[in-house]
Amino acid sequence: MQDKQKIDKFIDIRARLSKNAITAMERLEETGYEAYIVGGSLRDILMDRSVHDFDITSSAKPEKVMEVFSDFKVIPTGLKHGTVTVLVEDEPVEITTFRSESGYSDGRHPDRVSFAKSVEDDLGRRDFTMNAMACRINGELVDLFGGQKDIANKLIRTVGDAKERFSEDGLRILRAIRFAAVLGFEVETGTRDAIHQLGHMIEKVSEERIVSEFNKIMLSENPSTYLREYKDIICIFIPELEACIGFDQKNHHHVHDVFEHTLRVVDNTPAKLSLRLAALFHDISKPICFEIGSDGEGHFYGHASKSAEMAENILKRLKYDNATITDVCQLVKYHDHQIENSDKIIKRMLRRLGEEDFFNLLDLKRADNYGQSEEFRYRQDILQELERSARRILEENACFSLKDMAIKGSDLIKLGMAQGPEIGEVLEMLLDKVISGEIKNDRQELIACLKDTGAIE
């Protein structure tokens, strides 16, 4: 039975709508059509979350929408699916006709999209109850599937039969996990069971869409909760993780298996994508590199480099951008590298990693330590001292990269060096001497060094 009621929490829905969304809805209603705020924008309004884009659904067919807004710039963004974008004072307002969908032969997209007679029919095609509500400009709410109740109980629940919803579109499986992770919700029991039963539907989803959802899970407040609960789903597109689950490290540094240790590291890193991904992959090669040493303990010689190699293959397969791949692999490669607290060593690491990744590496090392046995927690103090030293070096404007040098390649050419790769090699040699403290980053002293080494006359 249809449940229409005033929104108690928001007596005046207008207070949460943009002026241009109000203009669009009023124009539609004044010309005899129904207009509703719907989907994620209404969900976020009900949850007191910020809303940037307002989705409007209407009884008006696309051509009628274009007539109603004939004095506005109208973009027929998706006429086939009933979507028209109206520019109201340069703000794009998307208006979609009530519609129904049927047939999902590819497990992702509907074979047929047709216009529906009512908003109730439109809401029935949506994925989750919290996204299947609609509200008119006067505050009249249509909530047929208990979306408000599920929001109050912090539950992700499909509209109707969960198996049907996930069989229609495999992406909904990841969306359910992502919504739970980002909102801090639980997935309702029947919906959760269907996710585990139909995980294979993810194989029909493009890498780009998988990555878009997975990144949001990784950047949520407590990703480990959802990576643990849905590890079978994650392993469908990152099968390399499967060997880590339950893998006993047999080492006194560790009280957790590789996967549980990894989850703790992920949770303890700041919410930066490259850092969280590096945390996920930092020990992924441990099952491959494992061996029992003469001391009777498990060892993982070379696992940092091997994990970086595996991370690169995984990220390329999932079509991550090159910058992210480079950052993640660099952090994984050096996560187990011991950094001595000396200006010379720290400058060399700053030179090798760059300022941002150097501090990201320290964050990864801290998180890695928190995932180990408590008896080694004293290393947090060592890492804190390293950070203090690095920040002091930066505050002193110490030279640790070519851009900081008091002499440039153009200067070497003016001093008589021939243009070519030798210029770069000479600059690197000078930088190395400056970092090691052999010479100062002073133009005259650098030129004197060039003469002493025979680089110039």
Describe every region a protein language model picked out:
Residues 1-457:
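Catalytic cores of the polymerase beta-like nucleotidyltransferase superfamily
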